[in-house]
């Protein structure tokens, strides 16, 4: 069962982007972007999110990192945890 739906992720992105003036991405448990302030990124793979899922910790990406990792930009990627399980990743650039 997927706890983090595209509808929920889109609402989180919209509300967070309004308050932070930052680009926000939400990725599912496979590292696929399911919601983004930058709509053209939806449906693409985010390698930074995959690193978060593998390491089970926050990952900060530099310009150098984003040059070699598919679908990334410099910023921070944090796990979304629900009932002690990572259900997705939020990225802020």
Model-derived segments and spans:
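Hydrophobic, helix-rich cores of sensory/ligand-binding and other regulatory modules
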Residues: 1-93
């Amino acid at each position: 069962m997927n706890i983090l739906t595209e509808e929920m992720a889109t609402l989180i992105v919209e509300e967070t982007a309004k308050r932070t003036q930052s680009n926000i991405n939400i990725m599912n448990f496979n590292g696929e972007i399911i919601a983004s302030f930058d709509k053209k990124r939806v449906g693409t793979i985010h390698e930074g999110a995959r690193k978060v899922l593998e390491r089970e910790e926050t990952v900060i990406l530099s310009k150098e990192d984003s040059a070699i990792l598919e679908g990334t930009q410099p910023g921070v990627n944090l796990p979304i945890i629900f009932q002690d399980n990572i259900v997705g990743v939020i990225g802020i650039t």
